[in-house]
Amino acid sequence: MTDNSQIKVIVGMSGGVDSSVSAYLLQQQGYQVEGLFMKNWEEDDTDEYCSAAQDLADAKAVCDKLGMKLHTINFAAEYWDNVFEHFLEEYKAGRTPNPDILCNKEIKFKAFLEFAAEELGATYIATGHYVRRDDSTGRPRLLRGLDTNKDQSYFLYTLSEAQVGQSLFPVGDLEKPEVRRIAEQLDLITAKKKDSTGICFIGERKFKDFLAKFLPAQPGPIETVDGKVIGEHQGLMYHTLGQRKGLGIGGRKDATEEAWYVVDKEVERNTLVVAQGEHPRLYSDGLIASQLHWVDRTPIRAPRRCTVKTRYRQEDIPCLIQPIDDETIRVIFDEKQAAVTPGQSAVFYDGEVCLGGGIIEQRFSHPV
């Protein structure tokens, strides 16, 4: 067995079950393990949903139980400047961003990693993400988590080989029920704590109410694909492609009983376009992506077949990548796909290996 006793690992302790069990597993592997709790959002006293205090208390209870030191750090300024302002700008532009991906890029695997290495003397950081690291080729590769239902590689595609090489993912080889079973055996306070959802670090708020605090309402028309105005929306930012609930346009006498879907957002006209049923306008043959991040940091310069996900927990889509330049690619799907959404990430795979990804700039219904 490898002697890890001189290797210091700082675990990002979120107050959840995955990071709790990650810390324990690293202890079992003989590492010097300490925890770090990151506060990345300043909650005011009037906030109905205050999660950070409870999460910190849970993280501290786990560290006490495991005999670990817990450090705390406030990255709220970095989060606001590097994640949240971008998030708001994207919504203003009528796009649908994924803050979790940017949060991993700017906070967990940049600010946290640098702080752990430079200030705490860590060789590695560790997180409770459901991904795996593979060093068998001599270069660190990012693999999907063993639990296909929980795999989080989609959110970590911006990582470089160097960042993967400085990170450990102890629960990546386990399935979620096994992680909970370990936590229950250890009698950890987080054993039955439900998984966090909602915006990274901000928590489970009513999204529309939360967004309204920062972005003013921008009402505009709801139009059918034929150009008929049938309602009003309060802001394109509140709607996503493929959405069918909360449109407020049901029960029309001049329509069939089929559900209405959002099929487009025309930002220039501030218009939400809807159609009934599985309308062709919802489907795309491919996409253009930019702001590319390849894990090995080598641009793709020749056509390449692989698979892609255009949203989390989606089935892999066989596709062909055609490079336009080092910063932009065209992706052609083998079969048409619904609700490909600008602002979201397209993440590429070769089997178990996460190759990297980029931001969806546009979708197309014929090769462009």
Swiss-Prot record:
Asked if NADP is a keyword of the record, the answer is: no
Entry's Gene Ontology BP terms: tRNA wobble position uridine thiolation
Q: Which residues are marked as site: Interaction with tRNA?
A: H129, Q344
Query: Which reaction(s) does its UniProt entry say it catalyses?
Result: S-sulfanyl-L-cysteinyl-[protein] + uridine(34) in tRNA + AH2 + ATP = 2-thiouridine(34) in tRNA + L-cysteinyl-[protein] + A + AMP + diphosphate + H(+)
Residue ranges, annotated region (Interaction with tRNA): 150-152, 311-312
Q: Which UniProt keywords apply?
A: ATP-binding, Cytoplasm, Disulfide bond, Nucleotide-binding, RNA-binding, Transferase, tRNA processing, tRNA-binding
Q: Please give the positions of the paired cysteines in each disulfide bond.
A: C103-C200
Q: Where is the active site?
A: C103, C200
Highest taxon of the lineage: Bacteria
Main localization, broad class:
cytoplasm
**Record-annotated residues binding ATP?**
G12, M13, S14, G15, G16, V17, D18, S19, M38, G128
Chain spans, region Interaction with target base in tRNA: 98-100
A single GO molecular-function term is: tRNA binding
Q: Where in the cell is it found?
A: Cytoplasm
Task: Please provide, in alphabetical order, the Gene Ontology terms of the cellular component aspect for this entry.
Answer: cytoplasm
The record, for Pfam families, names: tRNA_Me_trans, tRNA_Me_trans_C, tRNA_Me_trans_M
Enzyme Commission identifier(s): 2.8.1.13
Which InterPro entries does this entry report, sorted A to Z? MnmA-like, MnmA-like_C, MnmA-like_central, MnmA-like_central_sf, Rossmann-like_a/b/a_fold
* Keyword match Transcription regulation: no
In the record, the note on similarity to other proteins reads: Belongs to the MnmA/TRMU family.
Q: Which HAMAP family match?
A: tRNA_thiouridyl_MnmA
Instruction: Report the function annotation for this chain.
Output: Catalyzes the 2-thiolation of uridine at the wobble position (U34) of tRNA, leading to the formation of s(2)U34.
Name this protein carries in UniProt:
tRNA-specific 2-thiouridylase MnmA
